[in-house]
Amino acid sequence: NVVLPLIREDLGLSDVAVGTIATVFNLFYAMLVPIGGFIGDRFSRKWIVTASVLFWSIATMFTGLCNGFLMLVVMRSIATGGGEAFFGPANYSLIADYHDRTRAFAMSIHQTAYYIGIIISGYAAGYVGQLWGWRSAFYVFGAVGVVHGVIMAVRLKDKKEPAAVAAASAAESK
């Protein structure tokens, strides 16, 4: 994170503390991704993706309120990592549904946009952080994510029902 030097200085964090935050994030993310996939197969992927974006965006905004190591662990690792973990499986499943013969190309466009977003947001977060402080970068990016989540709630569509819902519907109609 490009605002990490500002956070480290403001909160007096050591390299070990910063590394611990990243480790706990990856631990929670890795534990929750399979659960996100399981849930994504059974419920509306539109709402899983939307709720994930909203949850992790709100957690991002709350990161700006952190005043120490423990709060950063909770907000960045548990809340943000937890939100992101449910996004991926449902998101990639939706992309696959919408692009049958062009699935690989669609995934490549998604990944390209993802990395372009990382590049642009890195610059923008550094700029905002330098002008108004590291907390402002989290408020701004969290707010942008909330707007994105609201747009997704309105515009995103589930192309087909998750397997468990479809199976339950078929069983009821017999």
Regions found by a protein language model. Name each.
Residues 154-174:
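Flexible cytoplasmic inter-helical loops of multi-pass small-molecule transporters
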Residues 1-15, 36:
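Extracytoplasmic
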Residues 31-70:
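Conserved MFS/SLC helix-loop-helix module at the cytosolic interface between two early adjacent transmembrane helices
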Residues 26-34, 118-119:
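Residue-level signature of mid-helix packing/kink "hotspots" within the transmembrane helices
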Residues 110, 114-158:
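Helix-loop-helix hairpin linking two adjacent transmembrane segments in secondary transporters
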Residues 20-27, 54, 108-116:
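Transmembrane alpha-helical cores of Major Facilitator Superfamily
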Residues 75-114:
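Cytoplasmic helix-loop-helix junction between adjacent transmembrane helices
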